[in-house]
Amino acid sequence: MFWLGLGYPLLAHLAVVTHDRRIEWLALVWLLGIALSGAMMQRRPWAWGALLAGSALLWWPVMAGKGLYALYVPPAAIPAALFMLFALSLRAGEVPLVTRIAILMHDGPFPDDLVVYTRHVTQLWCAVCAALFVSAVTLALFASPALWSLMTNVIHYVVLGAVFVFEYGYRRWRYGHYEHSGLLQYLRRLMRIRLKV
């Protein structure tokens, strides 16, 4: 799923800079495939039918020159949805999302100082997602399609990766007295988590 997700922004950017409607269509079908990937991996027949039907339905707006408008939606919708996910977990009586993930990855009792820290990391991700949403909407309204695409389909993902790596490095430095796995091992464990939201 992670690697499947990386393909979409690259296809979307390629579609924008080449003005190729076939690549626009492929990017939108790829996005639909990501949305249906869980059901398709569970071999649900309806998911494959939905992918085929959705692919056919996406062909007409793309060929009518409207595909670019659909490509503007994910760079704003994804950070908005993630912001809501992180922010709702910060409500009173809820366990912050990053805290829940850390507890699932941690062996043994979860230390109090890490409970406080992971709450702050959840707040950090709220701020990052809000900034990416504002950036995506502002660029969609005021920038050229090529600049919008470069920023939202390339630079925004670099920012996400940089924040992730910086937070990981800071946590290893600040909380070095706790056991930490290497970055690649940490990423593998993170991708295996089944989180109920």
Q: What does each model-identified segment do?
A:
Residues 1-10:
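Alpha-helical transmembrane segments
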Residues 38-79, 130, 134-141:
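Long, highly hydrophobic alpha-helical transmembrane signal-anchor segments
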Residues 4-5, 26-30, 47, 51, ...:
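Hydrophobic alpha-helical transmembrane segments of polytopic
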Residues 29-39, 55-60, 78-87, 158-163:
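Alpha-helical transmembrane segments and their membrane-interface exit regions
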Residues 10-23, 35-43, 64-65:
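Short, hydrophobic transmembrane alpha-helix segments
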Residues 1-2, 21-25:
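Phosphate/adenylate-binding glycine loop and adjacent helical scaffold
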Residues 67-125:
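Membrane-proximal helix-loop-helix units in multi-pass membrane proteins
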Residues 110-197:
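C-terminal membrane-adjacent module
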